[in-house]
Design a protein with these regions (language model features):
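Hydrophobic residues in well-ordered beta-strands that form the structural core
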Residues: 68, 106, 131-133
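A contiguous active-site-proximal alpha/beta segment in oxidoreductase catalytic domains
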Residues: 111-171
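Interdomain hinge/lid region at the active-site interface
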Residues: 225-265
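Rossmann-like dinucleotide-binding domain that binds NAD(P)(H)
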Residues: 160-226, 271-278
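C-terminal helix-rich "cap/oligomerization" subdomain common to oxidoreductases
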Residues: 72, 76-84, 260-303
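N-terminal glycine-/serine-/threonine-rich beta1-alpha1-beta2 phosphate-ribose binding loop
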Residues: 1-100, 125-126, 287, 296
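Short helix/strand-capping hinge loops at secondary-structure junctions
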Residues: 101-103, 108-109
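Aromatic/hydrophobic pocket-lining residues that form π-stacking "cages" and hydrophobic walls in ligand
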Residues: 93, 120, 146, 282-283
């Protein structure tokens, strides 16, 4: 049984993950096999420090030991999950574990800046540490079904992914919640986006990405009214329309985490994760420029 550690308790994900890995306080159809959360560091928070005190006892109720330092956690675990609510905290929270070569999963958003994203990737490569990231929205039942159906009626010519895109101080623009719909889009389209245009209003974002092969993918992120998740896929032989349920999203993500830590095979390549972050940063930049196109290669390029 793989021993997992959690780092930073300012998100409900620490409760959701602990319950599923440890098979407690959730229905049996939510149980995950192959790994167990054995210890965690409550840590600190730049976005919601008041939430830690509420989530910590719920995590402890799952049988998780509380420790205070990375060294203590390193003595107890085989792999870690960095769960800080703020993407800007992930680099420093992950650093001691990556430097120790410990397999690491980073929760959303992977990073809030291109510099941090590159630094995380470089730490993993330098210390030969297994590192990956994914949104739970990649792992819904509907997305998995849609991906299998594409094999029958593809190829895919484009897609529209939609869902909530609430903003929060600490995770700029689409990085906070728009990342979920963006990861849905990339799960279908794959990497290769060159440029984005974001027509943003206080109510929503409409981001059009253009891929190297001419395909276009759209992220529609809402901040008012009903904000369900869903996706439209435009294929050679038809148009597929899927409303997406999150019922099994956490379970499927947690199972993917356990399986990936066992196999050391990342379901989402690190280069794709870096492109997703660059896409979101470019979308935020396009919004600042009143919808002007932004090349992904502009992000982080100071020349």
């Amino acid at each position: 049984m793989l021993r997992l550690g959690l780092v930073d308790f300012d998100t409900s994900h620490v409760v959701e993950f602990s319950q599923r890995f440890n098979q407690t306080h959730v229905a049996s159809d939510q149980h995950v096999t192959g790994a167990r959360v054995v210890a965690g560091i409550p840590g600190s928070s730049v976005m919601a420090p008041e939430r830690i005190a509420g989530f910590q006892p719920q995590v402890e109720a799952c049988g998780v030991e509380i420790v205070n330092t990375p060294d203590e956690l390193l003595q107890r675990v085989d792999a870690v999950l960095i769960t800080s609510l703020c993407g800007g905290a992930h680099l420093e929270s992950a650093r001691p574990f990556l430097e120790a070569g410990v397999p690491t999963f980073v929760d959303k958003p992977f990073a809030n800046s291109w510099e941090d994203a590159l630094a995380l990737a470089e730490l993993a490569r330098k210390h030969d540490a297994f590192l990956w990231h994914a949104s739970a929205l990649r792992y819904t039942q509907e997305m998995q079904s849609l991906q299998s159906r594409l094999n029958e009626i593809g190829p895919l010519h484009g897609a529209v992914s939609y869902g909530p895109a609430w903003h929060a101080d600490g995770n700029p623009g689409l990085l906070h919640y728009g990342i979920h719909s963006t990861e849905q889009l990339f799960a279908l389209m794959g990497p290769g986006c060159e440029s984005v245009v974001n027509m943003s209003t206080p109510q929503s974002d409409a981001v059009v990405g253009t891929w190297k092969d001419g395909r276009q993918g759209v992220v529609r992120g809402g901040r008012c009214g009903h904000t369900a998740y869903g996706i439209l896929a435009f294929t050679e032989q038809g148009v597929l329309n899927e409303l997406v349920s999150t019922k099994y999203a956490y379970r499927n993500l947690c199972q993917a985490i356990a399986d990936a830590f066992q196999s050391k095979q990342a379901p989402v390549e690190l280069d794709e994760t870096l492109e997703v972050i660059r896409f979101l940063l470019a979308a935020n930049e396009s919004a600042k420029r009143d919808g002007s196109p932004v090349l992904l290669e502009e992000i982080g390029n100071t020349k």
